[in-house]
């Protein structure tokens, strides 16, 4: 008695369903609270520095810091001039938007463009309310290595440098992130050393840049998506 031959399954193999790509997790509560703290801190810095700057004088700690940095030796002129040119307000923002758009980082390009418009609009309004002149118009013993007659508070260089560094942060390799943060203090020191800004000018510009990015991060999810921020 012979056993029946085992039946082989000739049906076509079933295709396994492709695994769905993992969904990107929404910002955690800790991250959201960090941006809330950043927004409140930026408002405090901006209001405090604007109130002090509105008397159109340099005195106390600000005056001491200004002379300490502005009196640094002339051999630092070219490094600080290069740092100032690299952070040249509007042009660096336009360059970043173009580069990120060409690299198909459309969301980042849109974020930088929107933050630049918001930052410059805020800077323009506050600058004309505070109406603080540049250090050469406030002091007699200034090393004015670069001449600029526009109003000084807040610094547009400080604002745009802060905006770009914070927006690029999550797109950079981890090893470059902390190094990139050095751009902000390097730019701030260069503006004071060159005699174009007082210390509170760059503090005010930093506060505006931080505040603009914080507001963008704290917008409701649907609004961020409709604005193409997410």
Regions found by a protein language model. Name each.
Residues 45-49, 117-125, 183-196:
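Aromatic-anchored segments of alpha-helical transmembrane domains
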Residues 32-39, 94-122:
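Interfacial segments of alpha-helical transmembrane regions
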Residues 2-91, 127-145:
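N-terminal transmembrane-helix/juxtamembrane module of multi-pass inner/ER membrane proteins
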